[in-house]
């Protein structure tokens, strides 16, 4: 299943280029849906090289992972969050593909949560360092051998489990708040509630949402403010990531959203 998922998520064949420690550039071809054929590793922020499972180990470890998951689902002793947490950690320690492992890990987490009626989970960029720190703390407790990581227990990965549970709780609170908000003045971006200082900001966003090709003059007329003020607000919203202007046609794309 994970290989089929990988095949669906990445291009069938593509080349990856990397710079080696001596400065030379090497390349290799990624085969979608195929397990890795060369070792993979990562340099941690502490400067250490962290090795994942070898290509030789990978098929057997992935078979064990899938067998364990199916048995754990049938047994029903672990909650959906615990299942997703442990699967994610074990999968990451194997890193079975040469590229796209993060995407597959996130998709598998959401697949497990969805099977149990829970909403999809997003690991937002602002939590990335906390995520990496929690993984590192779990790695120290588990041991750095790939086979140890692939057989880790929930108790061993407690730091990562605590982080993951808090993340799920935070996202659920966001979803509930988003679904129950009734004010048109409240917007949302990247899992956070936004209340604008000026009522004209929400008017501008709504107008852009309705017509991505709207002009500065038209926005000024709708919001009842000067064109210069519109330009200033658009600049601020662009810097914060709420909107982005496409280079191809000049239209505006909105990343913030309203509940109503």
Regions found by a protein language model. Name each.
Residues 1-99, 103-260:
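FIC/Doc superfamily catalytic core
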């Amino acid at each position: 299943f994970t290989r089929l998922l990988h095949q669906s998520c990445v291009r069938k064949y593509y080349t990856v280029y990397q710079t080696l420690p001596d400065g030379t550039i090497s390349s290799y071809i990624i085969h979608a849906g195929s397990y890795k054929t060369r070792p993979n590793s990562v340099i941690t922020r502490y400067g250490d090289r962290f090795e994942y499972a070898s290509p030789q180990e990978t098929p057997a470890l992935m078979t064990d992972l899938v067998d364990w998951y199916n048995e754990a689902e049938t047994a029903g002793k672990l909650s959906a969050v615990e299942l997703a947490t442990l699967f994610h950690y074990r999968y990451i320690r194997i890193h079975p593909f040469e590229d796209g492992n993060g995407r597959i890990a996130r998709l598998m987490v959401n697949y497990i949560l969805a099977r149990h009626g829970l909403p999809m989970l997003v690991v937002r960029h602002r939590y990335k360092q906390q995520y990496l720190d929690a993984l590192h703390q779990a790695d120290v407790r588990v041991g750095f051998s790939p086979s140890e990581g692939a057989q880790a227990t929930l108790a061993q990965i407690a730091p990562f489990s605590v982080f993951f549970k808090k993340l799920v709780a935070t996202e659920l609170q966001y979803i509930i708040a988003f679904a129950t908000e009734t004010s048109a003045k409240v917007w949302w971006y990247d899992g956070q509630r936004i209340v604008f200082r000026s009522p004209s900001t929400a008017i501008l966003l709504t107008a852009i949402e309705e017509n991505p090709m709207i002009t500065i003059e038209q926005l000024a007329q709708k919001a009842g403010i000067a064109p210069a003020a519109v330009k200033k607000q658009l600049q601020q919203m662009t810097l914060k990531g709420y909107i982005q202007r496409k280079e191809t046609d000049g239209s505006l794309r909105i990343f913030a959203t309203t509940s109503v």
